[in-house]
């Protein structure tokens, strides 16, 4: 039975996109506390500044916003990537690998990835719990350019991952997220909506749950 809050659209290339009804499901709003800022000057090579100016113009953002994005990505993820031995893998390689993955392969990969995630969360956040685990996964997806979102419907939280890697990677993502949530909340019911490119994991965490508040 199809969830009435979900709209599944078929594209011309036969892939499907899941859309949550915006009149019912709202994007998670985090506290908009004004951050304290400082003004600082750095001396950079002229060529580097020219490239930053060009990139900011192409992205239609200010240089200040671009620099903040670069520094934020470094602080949230890049500075830890060497410590956790993170190696970038091109998307098309993952797509090709996914074609021949069996259910047994997915089980083995999930079991291999779980302790790596735990070690990474402890290394990056200083403690391993559900909030820090979710935040680390969100940091990873943002750093790698993978689309993700967190939406709230009353006490229900919808965690959306749009990977575009194919059906088997959707099955992997679904299984991994279920096992992570079950590790911390074994009694909670978890539902998933899955297409070849998107996974939506839904769990009741309460209307005040915020993965960035710890």
Regions found by a protein language model. Give the residues of each.
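Short Lys/Arg-rich basic patches
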Residues: 2-46, 53-57
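Generic solvent-exposed, charged/amphipathic alpha-helical segments
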Residues: 68, 134, 138, 174-182
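An N-terminal amphipathic alpha-helical segment
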Residues: 91-158
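C-terminal edge-of-domain segments
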Residues: 194-212
């Amino acid at each position: 039975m199809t969830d009435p809050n979900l709209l599944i659209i078929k594209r011309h290339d036969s892939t499907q996109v899941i859309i949550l009804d915006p009149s019912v499901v709202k994007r998670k709003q985090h506290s908009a506390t004004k951050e304290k800022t400082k003004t600082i000057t750095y001396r950079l090579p002229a060529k580097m500044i020219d490239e930053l100016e060009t990139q900011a113009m192409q992205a239609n953002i200010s240089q200040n916003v671009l620099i903040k994005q670069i520094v934020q990505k470094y602080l949230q993820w890049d500075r830890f990537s060497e410590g956790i031995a993170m190696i970038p893998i091109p998307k098309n390689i993952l797509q090709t690998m996914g074609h021949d993955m069996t259910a047994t392969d997915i089980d083995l990969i999930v079991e291999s990835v779980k302790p790596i995630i735990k070690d990474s969360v402890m290394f990056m956040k200083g403690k391993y719990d559900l909030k820090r685990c979710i935040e680390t996964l969100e940091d990873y997806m943002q750093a790698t350019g993978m689309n993700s979102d967190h939406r709230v419907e009353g006490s229900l939280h919808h965690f959306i991952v749009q990977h575009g890697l194919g059906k088997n990677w959707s099955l992997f993502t679904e299984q991994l997220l279920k096992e992570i949530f079950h590790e911390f909340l074994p009694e909670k019911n978890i539902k998933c909506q899955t297409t070849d490119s998107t996974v939506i994991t839904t769990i009741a965490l309460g209307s005040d749950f915020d993965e960035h508040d710890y």
